[in-house]
Amino acid sequence: MTEPTQTTEQTVQTTAVPTVALRAVAEGHAIEMPQLGFGVWQVDDAAAEDAVAEALRVGYRSVDTARIYGNEEGVGRALAAAGTDDDVFLTTKVWNDDHGFESTLAAFDASQQRLGRAIDLYLIHWPAPGTGDFVGTYRALQQLRAEGKVRAVGVCNFDIDHLEQLHAAVGEYPAINQVELHPNFQQKQLRAFHEEHGIVTEAWSPLGQGGDILSDATITDIASQYGVTAAQVVLRWHLQQGRVVIPKSVTPSRIAENFDVFGFELSQRAMDAIALLDNGTRLGPDPATFGG
């Protein structure tokens, strides 16, 4: 397609967000999850309520939270006020100190009470290999799914060894693995493993927490060529590779900007240029050692 040069207006989107298919209860069954969602990491409860309300107004229909974020109640209030419960895909997570079968069941009930609505996707936040029990925790997720309390289950921050251990113990791979992934940390080997085993890849910190990535000359040159922002280029790069992304912001203009990524398509040349930015720079904790 012809590469645009005009600046994209930041307007409320009406185009439906593409979805990915998550494995549900049985092999061959799947549920649809929006490919672009809204994250609320490091956002307090009151600010999360306002940010989610704005995100819903803009057009987001997927929200990602967690018990440890301390903002499930604010997210729930925003969803209830918007009256979009049936239309929004909701994800939350069990924290490391709630690992174990019974503890996870109790943690799920507490999260659901704080959110005030059904949870679509429940994730193990970290494998916590030194202190946690991700196998027992995942068995609890399987029970919640079998009972119809949650539609799909998955994990976050699992490396290949963790995924193989989990599969050996419970007989299945998770539907999704939410991991740190951005142009400087592309996790190519893990992504290949995901593709081989039908695991959806979801990127947290998809923009690399801002900073160097959004000022990188490769990214800014592409942004200038397309008449969009650096953040929009990076989000588009993720989406064109089939990933789920959950950018975070509390600024209304940025919330809208991050959603306005469906009016252009990066060329293969641009995609290849971004692929060359991978330098193995991890910004968050190492899943092999992090225990929370």
Which residues are covered by each model-predicted region?
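N-terminal binding-site loop/beta-alpha segment at the start of enzyme catalytic domains
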Residues: 1-88, 140, 289-291
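Acidic (Asp/Glu)-rich catalytic clusters
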Residues: 28, 76-87, 108-117, 145, ...
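Active-site mouth loops of central-metabolism enzymes
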Residues: 36-46, 93-101, 127
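Short, acidic/polar
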Residues: 44-56, 100-114, 163-164, 185-186
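A structural motif
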Residues: 60, 116-119, 150, 174
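A short, structured active-site edge motif that brings together acidic residues
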Residues: 86-99, 120-127, 157, 181
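Glycine/small-residue-rich loop that forms an oxyanion/phosphate-binding "nest" at active or ligand-binding sites
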Residues: 97-139
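Beta/alpha (TIM)-barrel catalytic core signal, keyed to glycine-rich beta->alpha loops juxtaposed to Asp/Glu
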Residues: 127-292
